[in-house]
Amino acid sequence: MGGSRSNRYAGVVVGRLGLKVAANDFARQWDDVREDALAAVDRVGGSGRLILGKEVEAFEVELAEWWGVSHAVGVASGLDALEIGLRCAGIGAGAQVLTTPLTAFATTLAILRAGAEPVWCDVDDSGGIDLDQVEAALRADSTIRAVMPVHLYGHPLDPAGLESLASEHGVVVIEDCAQSAGARRDDRPTGTAGIAAATSLYPTKNLGAMGDGGVLFSADAELAEQARRLRNYGQRARYEHGEAGLNSRLDELQAAVLRSALLPRLDRFLARRREIADRYAGALLGGPLRPIEAVAGASAHHLFPVEVVEGEPSAIAPRLEAGGIAVGRHYPVLCPDQGAVEGVGTAVGELPVARRLASRQLSLPIHPYLGDAEVGAVIEACREACA
């Protein structure tokens, strides 16, 4: 068939091999949430308050209740939430923070922005940081002050294992939950094992804003109050700045849309992600594309990652794309290999598992508006690409 015929939804066109499937579809989302989102915008516009008002306050309370934590503090990005969490925990200049090399660079960047130094430890086959290797690293180097684990792809790490690291080695644990909204393990949500946790509200996330944003979580009321000061220039009262803070405020419009249009749908979004992930996993099991699944617990399925165990990703990815399937790579360049950290930080060993996954991982489309026919098209394209 020559050319392609588009409908009104981005990423769904009839092409040479059938449906074209995009990684996300914000046009479909807008059709779903439009009425509630516009009502939220109208409410904010009529309130006369655009920054740090009742919408942010209400969203913080409602999200904390949904997530299962005591306190939530809305900020401008997930990166800022991580940095603020580190600063609230007293992690700064001269401190070492042990983290994963296989994740978005924001995790390492938050450590750098706090003035600390990253130490990267290898991951296991699920992509999550290997807690046994973390413990070995802490035993070998008692100067490490903090651990920043990432619940990568939405796969929950062991909360009891994280708590054990803190109690046995005296380190601060700050969890990166940017990808794990809705993940649970041992009947606990991610973000409850450390002194603080951070999530991202970037549009592609499980709970994504219509712009950017982030949230810091904590069970510690004093830490949460310090975070509220730090997000607003370190201001404790008008024109009184007790510490050097950031300009990092979640705005009223984003908070209103999140609490009115998106948070009420989040359980439905997560259920659909689980359905899609289960279908992919069943179809691909034992084949040349190994689903990279959680070790235990319920993944949030922010991504559906696979490891190419037969063939080469550089050959299979173009075949998938030719079949109309959007293919992601998460994350092809490890954090310690980025130019921004040249001469900075320390890797514990050669990081063989992280390097293997970085070179052989692909991400298949997964989002709550993906239709059954599109899921089938992805599966069929995977079979054809690997034939």
Language-model segment annotations:
Residues 83-141, 146-148, 320:
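Conserved PLP-anchoring active-site segment centered on the Schiff-base-forming lysine
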Residues 49-96, 110-114, 120, 188:
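Phosphate-binding glycine-rich loop
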Residues 1-49, 54, 365:
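N-terminal "arm"/small-domain region of PLP-dependent enzymes with the aminotransferase-like
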Residues 114, 168-169, 323:
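Helix C-cap/helix->beta junction micro-motif
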Residues 12, 56-61, 69-70, 132, ...:
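PLP-dependent aminotransferase class I/II
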Residues 126-209, 217:
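Active-site phosphate-binding strand-loop segment of PLP-dependent enzymes
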